[in-house]
């Protein structure tokens, strides 16, 4: 399936109940169980919802990802990614990233024991130099917000794999049209779907995509 077709068709199948070509919006909090402990794939909308599942399947497809999880905002997705870490862990973050990310790291997550070093991610040597024994994640944007710097993803993947560090990329500005970081070996891709993926300025949302089942299971 070509990319343009994926954008409009991936994850979308006729509704099994009515045959509707487009999926309905399921406005429900809970679901009837067939019996105790046995559901039809959904039990509570906070964990999953048929409408959201369609969105996630589509976003996974256009990122060439095995898994995608949608969130109520881009910052919710950012927070979920950092929650893969533990108190005492260290993050290397690009020094030109969305301000909400730096504020969250400096004003919220640092209170829970997460430390951060900011570096110019364009400089691979600077990233390598910043690595500590406790470093567990490298977080970068490419292009960056707002200066539109471009980071060498192949170099970042090499560094991350050598040190067994998670590599997360905010690819909001590029969109999957121009860049699919998972194809380079990145562990996690994040998008604020509020921006280009929505395109019409009427929704707020976020998504994390990955090819690693262990990461998906932990975030889900």
Where do the model's predicted regions map?
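Conserved PLP-enzyme active-site core in the AAT-like
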Residues: 9, 69-220
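Conserved N-terminal alpha-helix of the aminotransferase class I/II PLP-enzyme fold
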Residues: 30-79, 83-84, 100-107
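N-terminal glycine-rich, Lys/His-bearing helix-loop that initiates the first secondary-structure elements
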Residues: 1-42
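Sequence-pattern detector for short linear motifs
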Residues: 9-12, 49, 55, 152
């Amino acid at each position: 399936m070509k990319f343009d077709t994926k954008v409009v068709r991936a994850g979308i199948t006729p509704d099994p109940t009515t045959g509707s070509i487009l999926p309905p919006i399921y406005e429900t909090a809970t679901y009837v169980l067939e019996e105790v402990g046995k559901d039809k794939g959904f039990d509570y909308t906070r964990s999953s919802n048929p409408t959201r599942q369609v969105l996630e399947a589509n976003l996974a497809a256009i990122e060439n990802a095995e898994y995608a999880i949608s969130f109520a905002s881009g910052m919710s997705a950012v927070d979920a990614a950092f929650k893969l870490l533990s108190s005492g862990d260290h993050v290397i973050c690009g020094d030109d990233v969305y301000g909400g990310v730096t504020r969250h790291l400096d004003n919220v997550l640092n209170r829970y024991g997460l430390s951060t070093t900011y570096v110019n991610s364009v400089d691979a040597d600077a990233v390598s130099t910043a690595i500590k024994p406790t470093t567990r994640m490298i977080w970068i944007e490419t292009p960056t917000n707002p200066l539109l710097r471009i980071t060498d993803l192949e170099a970042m993947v090499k560094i991350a794999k050598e040190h067994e560090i998670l590599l997360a990329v905010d690819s909001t500005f590029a969109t999957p049209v121009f860049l699919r970081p998972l194809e380079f070996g990145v562990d996690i891709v994040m998008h604020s779907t509020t921006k280009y993926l929505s395109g019409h300025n009427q929704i707020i949302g976020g998504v994390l995509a990955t090819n690693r089942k262990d990461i998906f299971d932990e975030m889900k």
